[in-house]
Amino acid sequence: MSADAPEPGPGQSPGERASGGPEPSGVDLARVALRAAREAARARGDAAQQKKQARRGGLRSGARADGRDPMALGSAINRLITERGWETPAAVGGVMGRWPEIVGADVAKHCVPERYDEDERVLVVRCDSTAWATNLRLLAPTLVARLNEDLGHGSVRMIKVLGPGGPGGPGRRYGPLRAPGSQGPGDTYG
């Protein structure tokens, strides 16, 4: 180097001058970026940690329990339900599966839960006759109290009871057995 040429600064190759030499491009640009990344990693201490892990053979579990240890399937599902906030929908799904135990076998033969609206906290139940629908409407306050005791306070606010020919139901609207001008679904009253 000549005496009048300034020394290259940090991050500059010997061919570059501080007085506005050519910008790095191509392979030189990649080298500059790699050098900057290495310096940043060294400052963070990542390289030392990676070397330790490489010597040990990767991450290992110690003597104490951590989040990576195996767990029972039931525990894993309960953890997933809790993390995602699915407690109420999962509990209501369990209630729909245990419906005969909750309301009794006689009522369960004639009244079936259809769906649960989580936003309004309403359980929709369809009955196979208007008599059973009326019976379930009379039992609704007691049933809501029992469900909230089982699921947690406020899980079910109301039970909506549908008769046999309600919206979306199997009621007959036309056909040879349908009397002109009749209004009911062919049930006990209508």
UniProtKB/Swiss-Prot annotation:
Residues 163-172 have a biased composition (Gly residues). InterPro entries: DciA-like, UPF0232_actinobac. Signal peptide: none annotated. Residues 1-70, 163-190 are annotated as: Disordered. Residues 36-45 have a biased composition (Basic and acidic residues). Residues 26-35 have a biased composition (Low complexity). Belongs to the UPF0232 family. PANTHER family: UPF0232 PROTEIN SCO3875. This is UPF0232 protein SCO3875. It comes from Streptomyces coelicolor (strain ATCC BAA-471 / A3(2) / M145). The lineage of its organism: Bacteria, Bacillati, Actinomycetota, Actinomycetes, Kitasatosporales.
